[in-house]
Amino acid sequence: MSTHTNLPLLIAGLWRYLPARIVTNGELEAEHGLAAGWIARYTGVHQRHRVTDESSSYMGAQAAREALDDAGMTLADIDLILNASGTPEQSIPDTGVLIQRQLGVHAAGIPAISIHATCMSFLVALDISATLIAAGRYRSILIVSTEVSSAALNVREPENFTLFGDAAAAAVVTAPPQPWNGVLPAIHRARFETYSEGADLAALPGGGTRLHPNNPALQPEHNFFHMDGPGVLRLTRRYGMSFLEQLQPGLSHGLEDIDLVIPHQASRMGLKMLGAFGWPDTKIVRTLDMLGNCIAASIPATLYEAVRQGRLSRGNKVLLVGTGAGISLGGVILTY
């Protein structure tokens, strides 16, 4: 829960992978009997990418290869692979293992593990990576967030079924070799809070040891994701102001020295709520309309977009922030 400061960390490489298949609102509205324009009005999403035959590990490996190339590095430079995703490819073995296999280094011995905090997984992985690198435990870490949300969406809940998209993103992080214009890339502040009173507001009950395959109580609907969007927003509003003030004093009513905000692309209303904090719209990066909510891949995929558009440059200070199932709140302030 504590907010630490100034751990050197360089995002040396960054990339994303989007499935080729684009699913438009018109397609979903026609297929599921929804009124024309309903999806955009309700969710803020205009299209989303969805897999055809791609697996989570395949998408993650594709993003990882490009991120390594972007960093000018190879897998021989990587000490640890962190799968930071909310949707596992299978229960056992861990998706990190499957990503390693997809990368073709199955005999290299690179440790591959997972960090699972649903939509906040990438932020938690960044924070943990900075700590591990600062401690000298690892030098360079490959973080992969890969999500096939479409596998567990319930068509009976159009507000959720139409909101989510599939995507993967990867980042190579390491200790910065030198400052840029006198500014050292670092995580300046990071904070996470969880309020388990909201545990049932965003949940997929099946797939674990409670509603297991041999449990006679298991029903098909237990394997679908359910989210009470208004309930999540209410809980976020209750704790959001205090959380932001703990992350950095003054953040609940302005951005002070923050150059850009990369929020989790949770929903139209979730993004709209950011205006209540006095954050200028020009400093907020949005990809919800074109990608949908891509769970843990949302923040790194949007970060990638900001860099490629030239909105985020070396030496800029950026806020990565959002919520995840739990309900969990997370925020990281870093110099890119």
List the model feature ranges, each with a label.
Residues 1-53, 157-234, 238, 242, ...:
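Condensing-enzyme catalytic core mediating Claisen C-C bond formation in acyl metabolism
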Residues 22-23, 92-94, 126-127, 152-157, ...:
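Short acidic, glycine/serine/threonine-rich loops at helix termini
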Residues 12, 84, 116, 141-147, ...:
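Short beta-strand segments
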Residues 70, 74-106:
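Anion-binding (especially nucleotide phosphate/pyrophosphate-binding) glycine-rich loop
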Residues 57, 61-62, 68, 87-88, ...:
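Claisen-condensing/thiolase-fold acyl-transfer catalytic domains that form or cleave C-C bonds
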Residues 134-168:
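Flexible, glycine-rich active-site loops centered on histidine and acidic residues
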